[in-house]
Structure formats: C-alpha cells, structure tokens
C-alpha cells in the first residue's frame, strides 16, 4: 500500500503532467503546421502534408496520454493506484516513479510484451 507521502507525490506529479499535456493540446495545430499558400512545389507540398500527418498523430498520442493520466488520478481517488490490474499485487514505487500511469507490475508487463511479441511473430508475412 502506498504511503500518504507517496500518494501526495503522485497526485502532484500526475496533476502537473495533466496541466502540461492540456496546455500542449490547447495549442493550435495551425501554429505547428503553418503553410505558405503560394508554395506550389510538389516536394514542398508532400513534405508539408507529411508534417501535418505527423502533427495529428502526435496530437492523438497526447490525447491518449491525457486520458491515461486522468485514469491514474481516478485510481488514486479510488484507492487502487499502484495495484496491478492483472495480478492485484503492488506495483513498485520505482516503476511508478518511472511511469506513473502504469497499470501493470513489471512482471505482468514483461509477460504482456512477451505475449505480444509471440503473436506478432505468428502474423502472416505479405512479402
């Protein structure tokens, strides 16, 4: 069970991270992908399109991360923050400090990754 001090530490850390991510998400996309209207060069247009795609993928990733931070704060409120969703054991404080949105202990995360690796190796090759 997390100590009161650790709970306060993680609440502050997650709240700060949420504030930072929300500020990034509020930044207009056009400021990142501002394009000159007069540019008619095909290579420039392709490059700008690629930049726009990258920016939108980055925003999507930020949105998912915001949701994970909110979920971590909710787990803190519910008293289940730091408990592995797979085995119900405590997630180490060291792991939580490295990845405060973690929902799996390191052992369950390794098992999950190994399983995903095996499934990935079993996918048919289309080459």
Where are these regions (language model features)?
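Interaction interfaces in information-processing and related assembly proteins
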Residues: 1-78, 114-127
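Amphipathic alpha-helical recognition patches that constitute DNA-binding helices
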Residues: 9, 13, 86, 100
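Short, flexible, mixed-charge glycine/proline-rich loop motifs
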Residues: 72-81, 94-99
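Cys/His-enriched microdomains
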Residues: 82-85, 103
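Short, cysteine/histidine-rich loop/knuckle motifs that typically chelate Zn2+
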Residues: 86-87, 107
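Short, Lys/Arg-rich amphipathic alpha-helical interaction segments
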Residues: 93-127
């Amino acid at each position: 069970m997390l100590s009161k001090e650790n709970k306060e530490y993680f609440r502050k850390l997650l709240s700060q991270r949420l504030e930072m991510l929300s500020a990034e998400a509020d930044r207009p996309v056009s400021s990142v992908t501002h394009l000159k209207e007069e540019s008619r060069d095909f290579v420039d247009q392709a490059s700008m399109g690629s930049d726009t795609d990258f920016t939108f993928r980055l925003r999507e990733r930020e949105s998912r991360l915001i949701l994970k931070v909110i979920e971590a704060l909710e787990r803190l409120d519910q008293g289940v923050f730091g408990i592995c969703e797979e085995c119900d054991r405590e997630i180490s404080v060291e792991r939580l400090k490295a990845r405060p949105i973690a929902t799996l202990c390191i052992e369950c995360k390794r098992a999950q990754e190994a399983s995903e690796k095996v499934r990935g190796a079993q996918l048919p090759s289309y080459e």
